[in-house]
Design a protein with these regions (language model features):
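Active-site-adjacent structural elements in enzyme catalytic cores
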Residues: 1-140
């Protein structure tokens, strides 16, 4: 998979510090207790917890409906037309496929001459939480 592991803090009540491939429902089932994502931790408790991380070196704008001239457009799903500047993480609307393609797509765009990356909304459920987390860190 293209995303790193889920990071869980077990030093007190279990909480997810960084969402990954294994989601909170699966973790809750194994631990036999509710485990939720917590973005409130100010201390860096594990690798990959920096506020800015995974950045391609190009400004990134999230939750956009379109991209302009000289801007790459990262999209998700079936409603987007295949244009020169459009990079679909998953035309099948598969979050697993999107997660696998995320870093490859960011590297591909980085090697082109785009001035900015615009990202269409990605569902904020399941693996979409991890994708949005990495995009948010890359955009800072």
């Amino acid at each position: 998979i293209g995303l790193e592991s889920t990071v869980i803090d077990l030093t007190s009540k279990p909480k997810i510090l960084r969402p990954g491939f294994i989601n909170s429902t699966e973790i809750s089932k194994i631990l036999n207790m509710t485990v939720k994502y917590s973005s409130r931790s100010k201390a860096i408790k594990s690798p990959g917890m920096l506020k800015r991380h995974y950045s391609p070196g190009i400004p990134i704008k999230l939750n956009r409906k379109r991209a302009g001239i000289n801007e790459a457009f990262i999209v998700f799903g079936t409603k987007y037309k295949n244009k020169k500047n459009t990079f679909n993480l998953s035309s099948k609307s598969s979050l697993t496929e999107a997660a696998k393609n995320l870093y490859k797509t960011l590297r591909l765009i980085k090697n082109k001459n785009y001035k900015m990356i615009c990202v269409s909304p990605i569902p904020k459920v399941g693996l979409g939480l991890a994708i949005n987390d990495r995009l948010k860190r890359a955009a800072k």
